[in-house]
């Protein structure tokens, strides 16, 4: 397959070549990671007849690509299409335009006997039968994507380096267009992002595109996308600053949580002269705006138990002192949790009250951006007021942050307001919530991410979205080293017998390393350093079946079907003889679970 058109296109997508049978899951993970960092991937996700796939690939190269990723998965040697068609195309494109077209090899083959190195000879060895020139791939830079194994192999991901190099190359190629120091970044949170323009309102020639996949059930971004955003965002921000970007324009549509994360990542204190958010109506909400007149004011309200709203008694637009906020929200009680909703007149009271109840009946503060209307009809907030409103709302949140250790925040206002407000809140610890579907037509606020200062990423935590299986479990299997006895408040105890042998115990694997001995109090004490790994063995999920495992195994795995003994019962001698209940941890989604060891840990409350 040849093309008369040059393969390189500075803002074109990045082609992902992979073996469908053995590499589809890793390819989706790579795609998700790159999308979260501003790069648009191109991969054919359908298992079609060869002719159709070949036409799709040909079209992709003819339209122009900015780079390619060759994924080496265990099983790629069985592929015919990758070594015969895609690999030669990628190598040819790189040779034709080495500066404009980057080729990255992501290697999942571990070097024999090494805990963290990849087998650099794998490209040639795996593809040489059907691609005689495959050995030249060994000379290309290879990045690691290694899962842990039962032989001491550690999990290693260098996708951050792949993203860094792709961003750096793209910004270098587009430097003539970025000469004024301004960059355009398209945004999209939709069910199935692809390599095509988001829609007619997202300009296809934007320099970068951040796209998060939307969960079909909850209608909010998927947990895996948030976790990839957590790692990708600091890489993106570092490259923007390295390219001396001074003005950022975001455009398109997205959920408030993405807008909040971007605002925290580019706070007013950083070297950004102008931060602009172009909404889906083409209005620019700029950090430098000064409105000709003000029609939107800030009203501080709370919710009564029946869901009705009640003003806190402060004059509109007044920013109360910390002492005034304390009295209004907590009275004489100590300031703990607080639920905050940034709204633009519209809100759903019941999900807010349900969230407050979960947080030990925390007070609810509604920061309502009310736009006056002479005739009583709905009037939209003027975009030129956004910067000033964001600054004042940020001041209110900072005063709340001085009182409560943690703010629980949701936004029911334009996404631009979430971003402009967040730029003044990068020093606060905030748990952000999205209003999502939970089934049976019920809407509730779902905690999705945490932002706080002083860390490598503005997103310091992503919360699990796995569906609990408590209602589905009909049988429990004990996989701990000992019998587990349940002591109910009334009735006879019940015991789950221990497995027959230790090969069935679900335990966290570990590697040991002898260190120099401690010399204390005239004694020499040996010291062993323990490196924790994944759990093994891993029982297969089965409908209606739950597993009782050690607590540390449940915390490591984050599976919805893992339970552990909780609420200890002690015998007369003081030893533990059973439990009062079973415990479980928040479960990560099915897409996250295989990659949790390569991502940041679940935050602790």
Regions found by a protein language model. Give the residues of each.
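Conserved TIR/SEFIR loop-to-helix hotspot centered on a Trp-containing motif
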Residues: 74-96
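Long, low-complexity, Lys/Arg-enriched
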Residues: 116, 143-150, 154-472, 477-483, ...
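Switch/connector loops and helix/strand junctions flanking conserved nucleotide-binding motifs
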Residues: 77-81, 111-125, 351
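Conserved N-terminal substructure of TIR/SEFIR domains
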Residues: 1-67, 90, 98-99
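Surface-exposed interaction/ligand-binding surfaces
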Residues: 559-569, 573-574, 581
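Acidic, metal-coordinating catalytic cores used for nucleic-acid/nucleotide bond scission
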Residues: 19-22, 47-52, 74-82, 256-257, ...
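Structured domain cores in non-transmembrane regions
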Residues: 484-554
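Conserved beta-strand/loop subsegment of P-loop NTPase cores
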Residues: 68-70, 100-107
């Amino acid at each position: 397959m040849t093309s008369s058109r040059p393969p390189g296109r500075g803002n074109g997508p990045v082609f992902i070549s992979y073996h469908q049978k053995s590499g589809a899951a890793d390819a989706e993970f790579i795609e998700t990671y790159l999308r979260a960092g501003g790069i648009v991937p191109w991969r054919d996700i359908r298992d079609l007849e060869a002719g159709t796939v070949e036409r799709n690939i040909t079209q992709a190269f003819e339209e122009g690509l900015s780079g390619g990723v060759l994924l080496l998965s265990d099983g790629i040697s069985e592929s015919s299409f990758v070594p015969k068609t895609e690999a030669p195309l990628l190598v040819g494109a790189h040779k034709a335009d080495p500066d404009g077209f980057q080729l990255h090899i992501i290697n999942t083959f571990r070097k024999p006997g090494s805990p963290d190195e990849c087998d650099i000879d794998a490209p040639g060895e795996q593809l040489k039968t059907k691609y005689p020139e495959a050995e030249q791939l060994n000379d290309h830079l290879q990045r690691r994507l290694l899962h842990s194994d039962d032989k001491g192999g550690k999990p290693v991901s260098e996708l951050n380096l792949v993203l860094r190099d792709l961003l750096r190359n793209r910004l270098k190629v587009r430097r003539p267009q970025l000469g004024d120091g301004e960059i355009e970044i398209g945004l999209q949170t939709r069910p199935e992002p692809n390599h095509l323009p988001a829609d007619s309102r997202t300009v296809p020639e934007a320099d970068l595109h951040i796209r998060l996949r939307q969960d079909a059930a909850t209608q909010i971004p998927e947990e895996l996308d948030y976790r990839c955003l957590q790692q990708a965002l600091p890489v993106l921000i570092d490259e923007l600053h390295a390219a001396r970007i001074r003005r950022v324009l975001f455009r398109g549509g997205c959920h408030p949580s993405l807008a909040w994360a971007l605002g925290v990542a580019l706070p007013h204190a950083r070297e950004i002269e102008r931060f602009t958010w172009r909404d889906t109506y083409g209005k620019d909400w700029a950090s430098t705006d000064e409105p000709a007149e003000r029609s939107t004011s800030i009203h501080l309200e709370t919710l009564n138990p029946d869901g009705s709203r009640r003003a806190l008694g402060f004059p509109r637009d007044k920013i109360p002192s910390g002492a005034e906020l304390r009295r209004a929200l907590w009275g004489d009680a100590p300031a703990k949790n607080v639920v905050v909703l940034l709204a633009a007149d519209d809100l759903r009271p019941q999900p807010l009250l349900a969230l407050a109840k979960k947080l030990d009946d925390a007070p609810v503060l509604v920061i309502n951006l009310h736009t006056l209307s002479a005739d009583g009809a709905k009037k939209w907030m003027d975009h030129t007021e956004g910067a000033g409103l964001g600054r004042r709302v940020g001041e209110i949140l900072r005063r709340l942050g001085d009182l409560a250790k943690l703010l629980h925040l949701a936004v029911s206002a334009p996404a631009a307001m979430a971003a402009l407000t967040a730029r003044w809140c990068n020093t606060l610890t905030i748990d952000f919530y999205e209003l999502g579907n939970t089934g049976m037509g019920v809407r509730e606020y779902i905690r999705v991410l945490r932002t706080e200062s002083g860390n490598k990423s503005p997103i310091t935590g992503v919360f699990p979205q796995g569906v609990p299986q408590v209602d589905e479990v009909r049988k429990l299997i004990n996989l701990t080293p000992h019998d587990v006895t349940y002591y109910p408040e009334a009735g006879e105890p019940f015991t789950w017998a221990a497995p027959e042998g230790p090969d069935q115990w679900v335990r966290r694997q570990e590697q040991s390393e002898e260190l120099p001995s401690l010399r204390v109090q005239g004694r020499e004490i040996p010291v062993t350093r323990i490196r924790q790994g994944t759990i093994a063995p891993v029982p297969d999920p089965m409908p209606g079946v739950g597993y009782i495992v050690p607590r540390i195994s449940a915390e490591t795995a984050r599976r919805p079907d893992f339970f552990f003994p909780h609420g200890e019962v002690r015998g007369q001698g003081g030893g533990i003889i059973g439990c009062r209940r079973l415990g479980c941890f928040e479960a990560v989604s099915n897409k996250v679970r295989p990659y949790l060891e390569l991502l940041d840990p679940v935050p602790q409350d």
